[in-house]
Regions:
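Conserved, mostly hydrophobic/aromatic
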Residues: 95, 214, 252, 281, ...
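C-terminal motif of bacterial Sec signal peptides marking the signal peptidase cleavage site
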Residues: 25-26
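Carbohydrate-binding surface patches
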Residues: 345-400, 438
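C-terminal beta-strand-rich structural cap/linker in extracellular carbohydrate-active enzymes
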Residues: 416-448
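Boundary/entry segment of secreted carbohydrate-active catalytic domains
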Residues: 37-101
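Acidic (Asp/Glu)-rich catalytic clusters
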Residues: 53-58, 82-89, 102-118, 132-142, ...
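Noncatalytic carbohydrate-binding groove/subsite architecture in carbohydrate-active enzymes
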Residues: 122-132, 164-286
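Aromatic/acidic polysaccharide-binding cleft in carbohydrate-active enzymes
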Residues: 259-334, 339-351
Length: 448
């Protein structure tokens, strides 16, 4: 409300001066508003943060598998004919195995090292001096040592110097850590913290400072999709032991294929869930994921889920999950030194419910956008596969892209389709997203 008339009646002697003052005040307000508008127009708009690509090879390097190379009465006994050549064929660079004192076992680890596969060894009560001696013997072939494996489970009967879980676990981890740290030859070897069989038992163990890398065994329960419980259960419990800042590895995770068991899923569902599990954990910053396990240990005669976790059947024939992972690794591997990473100005529109994504880049400048539906591909109650219809979405890109090449690793290493768009520029594409990884290779226009 303008109070100028009241002021004028009260101060008639000063009417002229007040009139001038009011006029000048109004003018100044108008100028201020005009300046404000002008300034706002001149300021650059706040730029949205564009999705930043991660190194394609860092994704490939984040995958490992569990092995049991000393179980020579199982399929692992066929090291030369199946295990070694199939590990090489898969293309992984990391395995996890037990810390056994066995020269034949050591020789196998050294052989794998010569073809680019490093090992982490688990020690669950071995004398700490023995751990140091083993680490020295296998120097260069092992990349980390790991503390007690699921010592909270009665099944493993863990005990150290008469102490069981949790006291014995803490004591052993501390003494193993100390022995490795004081020896000049092993002090730089990373040490992985203990794993829990049941995540909630992390509360009993508490924070453990004697290690460099956190650990979790993140098996999705009851045939559920890979994201089930990862954010609400597995990672929080692991962080109870490791704290908030140390890198986190999942040293065991996966699915078995004995479908009569509550935890079992079909091989078809495994080819969908296992690559998605890897992607989902990578998206959450889990630095390494070790699938359990590489091969079915024995032919399934009695119906045992434990014998059906393999990516390979016991005769060495590949399950669909093995082939899918092999194709994904072959497509995305890109070893070499670090390089500048780009961002991608893009947006998915349409029905994007449950459509998840990962953006990667190779050193040649090509970007790889991986899309999948994070949905239930297996009905655990009915024990059957679920047919998931592709989700139709639109990919809109402001970053200049000259070509898009699509791959479906579950089917082939070869392209499914490609698009060059109009005038050599792809701005918008209709995409059908399945419940398994769809890899879109995006070639920047500047490369043409």
């Amino acid at each position: 409300m303008n109070n100028f008339p009241k002021l004028l009646n009260r101060y008639k002697p000063y009417a002229l001066s007040l009139l001038i003052a009011n006029f000048l005040f109004a003018c100044s307000q108008q100028v201020a508003v005009t300046e404000s508008i002008f300034t706002a127009q001149q300021k650059p708009s706040v730029q949205k943060k564009l999705p930043q690509a991660r190194s394609s090879d860092s994704f490939v390097d984040s995958l490992g598998v569990n092995t049991h190379l000393t179980y020579t009465d199982t399929a692992y006994g066929k090291f030369d004919n199946i295990i070694k050549p199939k590990l090489k064929e898969l293309g992984i660079r990391h395995i996890r195995d037990g810390g056994y004192q066995d020269q034949t076992f050591f020789d196998k680890i050294k052989q794998l090292n010569r073809i680019g596969i490093k090992t982490i060894l688990i020690f669950s009560g071995n004398p700490p001096q023995e751990v140091v001696a083993t680490a020295k013997t296998l120097k260069g072939a092992i990349e980390a040592v790991e503390g007690p494996n699921e010592s909270d489970l009665e099944h493993f009967k863990f005990s150290y110097n008469g102490q069981k879980f949790p006291e014995g676990t803490r004591t052993y981890q501390k003494e193993m850590f100390t022995e490795l740290e004081v020896d000049p030859e092993t002090k730089s070897l990373p040490i992985i913290l203990p794993s829990m069989g049941w995540g909630e038992n992390a509360q009993k163990l508490g924070y453990v400072p004697w290690g460099d890398i956190g650990n979790m065994h993140s098996y999705p329960n009851l045939g559920n999709p890979p994201t089930e419980d990862i954010d609400s259960y597995f990672i929080p419990h692991a962080r109870t032991i490791t704290g908030k800042t140390k890198p986190l590895w999942s040293t065991e995770t996966g699915y078995h294929n004995y479908i009569k068991d509550d935890l079992g899923i079909s091989e078809r569902a495994g080819a969908r869930y296992i690559p998605r599990l890897w992607l989902e954990q990578f998206n959450r910053g889990v630095k390494r994921v070790y699938l359990y396990e590489f091969i079915n240990q024995r032919p399934d005669k009695e119906g045992d889920g434990q014998n059906n976790y393999g990516l390979l059947r016991s005769d060495g024939s590949p399950k669909p999950s093995f082939t899918t992972l092999k194709n994904l690794i072959s497509l995305l591997k890109d070893p070499g030194s670090s390089f500048p990473l780009k961002s991608l100005d893009y947006k998915l529109s349409g029905n994007t419910t449950d459509v998840h994504q990962t953006l990667l880049q190779k050193r040649d400048g090509n970007l790889y956008l991986i899309l999948w539906q994070e949905v239930r591909s297996w009905d655990n109650k009915k024990k059957k596969d679920v047919a998931i219809a592709d989700r139709k979405v639109t990919l809109n890109m402001n970053t200049p892209i000259s070509q898009v090449v699509a791959y479906q690793p579950i089917r082939s290493i070869n392209p499914s389709w490609r698009s060059t768009g109009k005038a050599g520029r792809v701005k918008q594409l209709s995409i059908s997203v399945p419940d398994h990884p769809l890899v879109l290779k995006l070639v920047p226009a500047s490369k043409k």
